[in-house]
């Protein structure tokens, strides 16, 4: 078998096949062939390098090259650009031709070597399933691709193609992409990562370059190969019956490597939530990270000690974004009893009921409130001018860090007086919210649910503590709207004065929950909890509240909850 890695060059002012060099340590992790294979060969080609791509490839080959029967290494270290390119990510005709020639060279080598199969894989395609090759080979199909997930609706296959070789929308795409139908399906095109069987007469006629003599479609490597398959009568399939891995959404021609790096970081974060996560290879050195607090005095992460997986995921996400944070052990509602609550001075706000289920306060909600309250106390005690507070179930939107930094810079420039800014929440009446003049990314916050992510000023923390909320407690996400006087229940508001918290919200939002009620992985330590004054230890799953449902008013940046722009080859 011949195993081909198409490693694109990357970094700084690199040209042609460019990917940020931080992709490579992750790409290399699972590129190990099944031990059952008798012989294998690894091949790699890079060009247009001005960063450490070549060094990283050589480092990886030095560690694992002995595992392969043959290693073919081709490197062109001279950096160069194409005369008519608009930017480092612009695919010119010359670039497409160069890529097709390299693919053809790899295909010819595989045939000469007597290989049974050849696997092509782009460096921004991450195979997290180490059984991918075995699963594809067992299908016994001439050309087959593992369906890869991405941050948007983009994937590595087309369900339809026009007679002129352009993309055609079909009714089958979304059910396939979303795995509403599972299996292996015949499609007109696969690209980026796919396996080609070299054991049939039909596939012997396949070629990347030169194009077929009758070829009149667009000059693009993936379309040229799709036409070659069609002309040779070779069926093409995509399989989505397993989670195989991920692919990064491409950037626009005028954008550069920094934007692609940002996209890839977001892909890593999505994989941490949805799984399986991407693991960096031990055989490749990763570029160093320099985490900071983004100009805040502190970044807090509230996390229960008995939820280590959620904590680890959150810290990994922040690390990938180079955000330095401190974990605050959340107060566990399961450890609370009446005597502890009495000692803390905790009492229920008279008349409080959940707005949907009608239940009373739960111990989980008490623990959540006390966790946030302890941070407010620390902010005041240490005189911290501004902080960020995260809960440990945050799904970050694309380019979270830069967007937050830009938002805070704009707030400072406009000299906005603020106490609290929601970064993630569930809006109840978004149509009533007013945009802040001079700050297009900010609105005056209305009644909202959730406290999964927000910024807080010293003045805001002082106002929250001054209201003495422990003596008349309600859930923290109900308390905050009371304090900025936007809660619809006047009886609740009557217990607090003044209600002058200056609260705003990012729009579009920068964060959302990792999961919602009804999702397979959803869990809640506030909804699955005993009533606040019940010491029996019984856990009740409260299903009546709609706060944790996936609501229509999230107002994230994209219709799917993601803010990345569709790729030209995207379904959208």
UniProtKB/Swiss-Prot annotation:
Source species, domain of life: Eukaryota
Gene name per UniProt: Cercam
Family matches, as SUPFAM superfamilies: Nucleotide-diphospho-sugar transferases
Organism: Rattus norvegicus
Keyword S-adenosyl-L-methionine carried by entry: no
Sugar-bearing residue positions: 52, 130, 214, 337
Primary location group: endoplasmic reticulum
InterPro entries, sorted: Collagen_mod_GT25 (IPR050757), Glyco_trans_25 (IPR002654), Nucleotide-diphossugar_trans (IPR029044)
Function, as annotated: Probable cell adhesion protein involved in leukocyte transmigration across the blood-brain barrier. Does not express any beta-galactosyltransferase activity in vitro.
A family per Pfam: Glyco_transf_25
Transmembrane feature ranges: none
GO function term, MF aspect, one: identical protein binding
Family to which this protein belongs: Belongs to the glycosyltransferase 25 family.
Subcellular compartments: Endoplasmic reticulum lumen
GO cellular component, one term: endoplasmic reticulum lumen
Keyword set includes GTP-binding: no
Motif Prevents secretion from ER: chain residues: 569-572
UniProt GO BP: cell adhesion
Name assigned to this protein: Probable inactive glycosyltransferase 25 family member 3
UniProt keyword annotations, A-Z: Cell adhesion, Endoplasmic reticulum, Glycoprotein
């Amino acid at each position: 078998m011949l195993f081909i890695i198409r490693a694109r060059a990357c970094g700084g002012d690199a040209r042609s096949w460019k990917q940020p060099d931080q992709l490579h340590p992750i790409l290399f992790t699972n590129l190990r062939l099944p031990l059952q294979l008798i012989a294998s060969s690894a091949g790699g080609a890079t060009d247009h390098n001005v960063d450490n791509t070549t060094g990283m490839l050589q480092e990886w080959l030095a560690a694992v090259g002995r595992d392969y029967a043959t290693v073919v290494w081709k490197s062109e270290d001279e950096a160069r650009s194409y005369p008519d390119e608009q930017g480092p990510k612009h695919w010119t005709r010359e670039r497409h031709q160069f890529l097709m020639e390299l693919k053809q060279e790899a295909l010819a080598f595989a045939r000469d070597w007597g290989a049974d199969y050849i696997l092509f894989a782009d460096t921004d395609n991450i195979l997290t399933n180490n059984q991918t090759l075995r699963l594809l080979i067992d299908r016994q199909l001439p050309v087959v691709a593992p369906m890869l997930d991405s941050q948007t609706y983009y994937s590595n296959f087309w369900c339809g193609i026009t007679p002129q070789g352009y993309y055609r929308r079909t009714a089958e795409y979304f059910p396939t992409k979303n795995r509403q139908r599972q299996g292996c399906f015949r499609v007109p095109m696969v690209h980026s990562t796919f396996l080609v069987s070299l054991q049939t007469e039909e596939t012997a006629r396949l070629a990347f370059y030169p194009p077929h003599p009758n070829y009149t479609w667009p000059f693009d490597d993936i379309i040229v190969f799709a036409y070659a398959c069609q002309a040779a009568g070779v069926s093409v399939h995509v399989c989505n019956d397993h989670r195989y891995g991920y692919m990064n959404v491409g950037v626009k021609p005028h954008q550069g490597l920094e934007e692609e790096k940002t996209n890839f970081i977001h892909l890593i974060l999505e994989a941490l939530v949805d799984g399986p996560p991407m693991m960096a290879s031990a055989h490749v050195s990763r570029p160093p990270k320099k985490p900071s607090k983004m100009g805040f005095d502190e970044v807090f992460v509230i996390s229960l000690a008995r939820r280590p997986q959620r904590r680890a995921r959150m810290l990994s996400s922040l690390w990938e974004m180079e955000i330095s944070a401190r974990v605050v052990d959340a107060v566990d509602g399961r450890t609370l009893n009446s005597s502890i609550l009495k000692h803390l001075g905790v009492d229920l706000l008279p008349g409080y009921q959940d707005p949907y289920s009608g239940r009373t306060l739960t111990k989980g909600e008490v623990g959540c409130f006390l966790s946030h309250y302890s941070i407010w106390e620390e902010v005041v005690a240490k005189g911290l001018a501004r902080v960020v507070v995260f809960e440990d179930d945050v799904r970050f939107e694309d380019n979270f860090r830069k967007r937050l930094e830009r938002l805070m810079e704009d707030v400072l420039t406009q000299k906005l007086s603020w106490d609290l800014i929601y970064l993630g929440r569930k809006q109840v009446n978004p149509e009533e919210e007013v945009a802040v003049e001079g700050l297009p990314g900010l609105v005056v916050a209305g009644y909202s649910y959730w406290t999964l992510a927000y910024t807080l000023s010293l003045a805001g923390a002082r106002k929250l503590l001054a209201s003495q909320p422990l003596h008349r407690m309600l859930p923290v996400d109900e308390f905050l709207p009371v304090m900025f006087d936007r809660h619809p229940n006047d009886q609740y508001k009557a217990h607090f004065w003044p209600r002058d918290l200056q609260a705003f919200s990012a729009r579009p939002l920068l964060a959302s929950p990792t999961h919602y009620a009804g999702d397979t992985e959803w869990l809640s330590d506030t909804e699955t909890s005993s009533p606040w004054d019940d010491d029996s230890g019984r856990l009740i799953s409260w299903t009546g509240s709609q706060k944790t449902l996936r609501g229509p008013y999230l107002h994230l940046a994209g219709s799917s909850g993601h803010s990345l722009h569709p790729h030209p080859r995207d379904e959208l």
